[in-house]
Amino acid sequence: MDQALNQKIDAYIAQNKEQLLKDIAALVAVNSVEGTPEEGAPYGAGPRAALDKTLELAAGMGLATRNCENYIGYAGLAGKDPEKYLATICHVDVVPVGNGWTADPFTMRIQDGWLLGRGVADDKGPMVATLYALKFLKEQGYELRYPIRALAGTNEETHMQDVDYYLKNYPAPAFCFTPDAEFPVCNGEKGLFGAKIVSPVCNGVIVEIEGGVANNAVPDRASALVKTDISKLKNAPNITLEPEGDGVRIRGWGKSGHAAMPQGTVNAIGLVVNYLLDNGLCNETERTYLEAVRKLHASTAGEGLGINCADGPFGPLTVIGGRIYMEDGRIFQTMDSRFPTCTNGKKMTEQIRAALGDGAELRDVTAAEPFYIEADSPAILACINTYNEVTGENAKPFTMGGGTYARHFPYAVSFGPEHVDLPLPEFGGPMHGANEAAPIDKLLEAVKIYIIALLRLEEIDF
């Protein structure tokens, strides 16, 4: 590594650290959960406000900015190539808050070297880190071969329609990386499968059932209101019972986490469904439906639905049920699966429908196939070599179950800044969970990695 450059970057980061943290706090302060579309805000007022704040921060750094019709925006640096450009892409929308927070999710806190708040890790902290990488390049006066855009998306957590809009109306970058996953470099993503398991109109024992705040997150709380006498019910682990009106409120208490990494989570919906079935708290229509839903919750590897499989690049399939709710007398259970190359959306649909039987209907199926980029391609090598030189590691590219913006671009990967092996503090939680946490030192290290990686990408013939 160029030692002079290394020293310049270290001095720059030290000089800008406090302002960088203030900028993350300013962005975290914007509640950017997807809302109702309105004029000038296709994904609601919150994501639009977060986009405005991002572009305001970038402009304050002296970067050129552009709002792409309120779907997406970017901060940019000019380059000599009139056609090709490099890009980073983060997102400034966030998942719903959920339960279990010990403080206001939109007021960033600092504790023992960690940032706490919704979006500090996913993906507002990384968004600000990329802006500071571009700020360094601008202040140092680099004459770039390729222009660079730091894209800011506003619809990543739900449908990624923002990047679809961008790619329909703007040219795609020659190469793009998204700081929305783990280091070192993710060169492949599992396929994405989503659907709803829907009941017939029940009119039975279950008055209400609800749980979860996002389709792509394992819920830590769920409940059902049923017509029964509490004296007839048995206690069960992670279940509480409360009289409510003429019935009983049954609450399940689990452990939340991301759909792509469900290991170690406990799905509260599954706890409630099992309790209802084990205690006969359902009529025949409800029982048949809940038995089908139980197959979903039986295993995060998909064994209950008969969709389990694994391959070399990606490992095993995962599946979770993120939300359950009632609407017009029907029960809806969402499902989110991340699948390897040994299956596909059509095959999974057939297998799941066969497993569900006649008591439940599979609706609103969506599927996106896996993607994979060879690890020895020049851009991948530029990223992985930079990471290893900065950290002193000998890490290799990896694949994952998370779905990022990378799959939407012709040539893209995800590139940090999470560290999967770094244990969370007792007071901190994961992405999509309560008390979302990000380590300050690793975020600052990511700024250095992104600066050097962008300079190396500038040297590649795309």
Question: Where in the sequence are the language-model features?
Answer:
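Acidic-glycine-rich active-site phosphate/pyrophosphate-binding loop
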Residues: 95-110, 192-193, 198-199, 242-252, ...
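Zn-dependent metallopeptidase/amidohydrolase metal-coordination segment
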Residues: 12, 385-389, 393-460
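Midchain, well-structured core segments that form catalytic/ion-binding scaffolds
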Residues: 157, 164-341
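Active-site metal-coordination/substrate-binding segment of hydrolases
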Residues: 83-152, 158, 171, 428-442
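Short amphipathic alpha-helical face segments that pack within enzyme cores
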Residues: 125-136, 270-274, 445-452
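Acidic/His- and Gly-rich active-site-bordering loop/insert found
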Residues: 2-118, 142-144
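Acidic, glycine-rich active-site loops and adjacent beta-strand->loop/helix elements
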Residues: 92-94, 148-159, 179-184, 213, ...
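Substrate-recognition/cap regions that form aromatic- and gly/pro-loop-enriched pockets
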Residues: 326, 331-402
